[in-house]
Amino acid sequence: MGHEYIGIHKGWLERFAGRIRYAEGNAEIAPGITLVPHSTAGLERIGEMAHLSVKENGKYRYDSFDHEQSLVFDASKGLFVMNSCSHGGADNIVKEIEATFPGKKIYAILGGFHLFRYKDEVVRAFAERLRELDVQKIYTGHCTGNRAFEIVHEVLGDRAEQMHAGMTVEL
């Protein structure tokens, strides 16, 4: 399998070193705003299914997404979770956030779900898991894919909205 680099532009970490603050574990960056790392074990199987790898010590392995984070806002309606591509699975991310903030309700999740390459039955099973987690609003777009969004919307109804330029979401 060929590999294509899709990470941070080479040289940027060094070029912008003075502007980057590395976070380990949960990091409250302002009152009510927390960065939460992804820690679900076994996500390499999703990396394999999505054909996403990382290079470590000159060798490739399937990505476990342990370097990805969620930005969580503790808002009046409940927790609002933001992600980019949710590579490790938005359903897994919701479970991680629930474990991180016990007793707090997750109101919404916003991000791409990286489902554009998956078969319909995989997307449907994902949407059903998300429904069981009882998140009230799902805002998705980007790498979710149009067909996958159709399936997610079919399962979740108006709880699922497709993101678009100029969209406003109130916390």
Predicted regions and their residues:
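Metallo-beta-lactamase
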Residues: M1-Q69, E161-E170
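Cap/insert and terminal regions of metallo-dependent hydrolase folds
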Residues: Y62-S70, D74-V81, C85-A165
